From Swiss-Prot:
Keywords linked to the UniProt accession: Chloroplast, Plastid, Ribonucleoprotein, Ribosomal protein, RNA-binding, rRNA-binding
Organism: Piper cenocladum (Ant piper)
Main location: plastid
Gene: rpl23-A
Gene Ontology biological process terms from the UniProt entry: translation
Protein name: Large ribosomal subunit protein uL23cz/uL23cy
């Protein structure tokens, strides 16, 4: 899982699951083709569309020094009907 950082669980991403669309944050340097190839290879699914947007890092302040966190990219991956990605969360006991 080089390119994908983690799966996003927001109200919008949960709503998109009904349309067979999965939302995840990926490395900002990753391209759509890399992520599409990786998802198809790793999960054995067929990707028909990908939407992405770049999110700015949040501002951070440490005393007089002002900085920011890293930028990242969010991908919305649409799969062909009949395919699905299994949940990536493991239950902790």
């Amino acid at each position: 899982m080089d390119g994908i950082k983690y799966i996003v669980f927001t109200e919008k991403s949960i709503r998109l699951l009904g349309n067979n669309q999965y939302t995840s944050n990926v490395e900002s340097g990753s391209t759509r083709t890399e992520i599409k190839h990786w998802v198809e290879l790793f999960f054995g699914v067929k990707v028909i569309a990908m939407n992405s947007h770049r999110l700015q890092g949040k501002g951070r302040r440490m005393g007089p020094i002002i900085g920011h966190t890293m930028h990242y990219r969010r991908m919305i991956i649409t799969l062909q009907p009949g395919y699905s990605i299994p949940p990536l969360i493991e239950k902790r006991t």
